[in-house]
């Protein structure tokens, strides 16, 4: 189903409700540049982290596409756990897991309060940016403390530039991308307004500093397009 969420006037802040869940896969493909390519990076490193089994969490798993792809490529059995606080997303995730016969645990949970087991891998795709800055660092600390030594945290985020002109140009570049994907100027403005004060991105440097401050020995960008970046942090 095609994303038409913002073709009409929106009178509320953005939320992952049934209307968004119904078109979310299409929304990702058309809103996140090189989404499939960044996902393939996550899949590759997931195979590395889980080559001897273990546990992996996807925080904000949405419709579970990434976990399903990981499960199909694993050579050894591993425990894959998807967490999301949107029941609409999880309902679609469960149907997809059933259709693909994917053995994935899906839970409606608050990722800030969840009691994590010791894990080999955490993945967070465009989720941290929706966590308020005051508690974002606490979540990353919790992730680090729940990982085994040398465990991986793969996270993708929209990023900002602290150079005002470059920041403006990167946004313009991204809006050109969205127009190429068929979104109208009206839809772009509507979504931007709906996300205001809901999606709060950091710069590339701020994300790396946060990871290192929270218990990771190393963190770097492994993929970037304009103002979208994928990071890998190693405990």
Swiss-Prot record:
One of its GO terms (molecular function) is carboxyl- or carbamoyltransferase activity. HAMAP family: Cx_SAM_synthase. One of its GO terms (biological process) is tRNA wobble uridine modification. Belongs to the class I-like SAM-binding methyltransferase superfamily. Cx-SAM synthase family. The keyword S-adenosyl-L-methionine applies. This is Carboxy-S-adenosyl-L-methionine synthase. InterPro entries: CmoA, Methyltranfer_dom, SAM-dependent_MTases_sf. NCBIfam families: carboxy-S-adenosyl-L-methionine synthase CmoA. Catalyzes the conversion of S-adenosyl-L-methionine (SAM) to carboxy-S-adenosyl-L-methionine (Cx-SAM). It comes from Sulfurimonas denitrificans (strain ATCC 33889 / DSM 1251) (Thiomicrospira denitrificans (strain ATCC 33889 / DSM 1251)). The lineage of its organism: Bacteria, Pseudomonadati, Campylobacterota, Epsilonproteobacteria, Campylobacterales. Homodimer. It is an enzyme of class 2 (transferase). PANTHER family: CARBOXY-S-ADENOSYL-L-METHIONINE SYNTHASE (PTHR43861:SF2), TRANS-ACONITATE 2-METHYLTRANSFERASE-RELATED (PTHR43861). Its EC number is 2.1.3.-. It comes from the Bacteria. It catalyses: prephenate + S-adenosyl-L-methionine = carboxy-S-adenosyl-L-methionine + 3-phenylpyruvate + H2O.
């Amino acid at each position: 189903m095609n994303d038409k969420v913002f073709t009409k006037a929106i009178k509320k802040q953005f939320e992952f409700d049934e209307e968004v869940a119904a078109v979310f896969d299409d929304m990702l493909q058309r809103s996140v540049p090189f989404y499939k390519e960044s996902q393939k990076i996550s899949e590759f490193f997931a195979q590395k982290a889980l080559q001897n089994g273990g546990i992996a969490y996807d925080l904000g798993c949405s419709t579970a596409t990434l976990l399903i792809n990981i499960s199909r490529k694993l050579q050894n059995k591993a425990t894959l756990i998807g967490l999301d606080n949107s029941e609409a997303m999880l309902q679609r995730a469960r149907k997809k897991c059933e259709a693909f016969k994917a053995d994935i645990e899906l839970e409606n949970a608050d990722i800030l309060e969840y009691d994590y087991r010791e894990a080999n891998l955490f993945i967070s795709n465009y989720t941290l940016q929706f966590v308020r800055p005051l508690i974002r660092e606490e979540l990353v600390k919790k992730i680090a403390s729940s990982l085994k030594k040398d465990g991986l945290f793969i996270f993708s985020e929209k990023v900002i530039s602290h150079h005002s002109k470059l920041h403006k140009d990167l946004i313009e570049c991204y809006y050109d991308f969205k127009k190429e994907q068929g979104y109208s100027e009206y839809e772009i403005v509507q979504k931007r307004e709906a996300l205001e004060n809901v999606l709060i991105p950091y710069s590339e440097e701020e994300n790396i500093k946060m990871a290192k401050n929270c218990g990771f020995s190393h963190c770097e960008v492994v993929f970037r397009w304009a103002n979208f970046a994928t990071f890998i942090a190693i405990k």
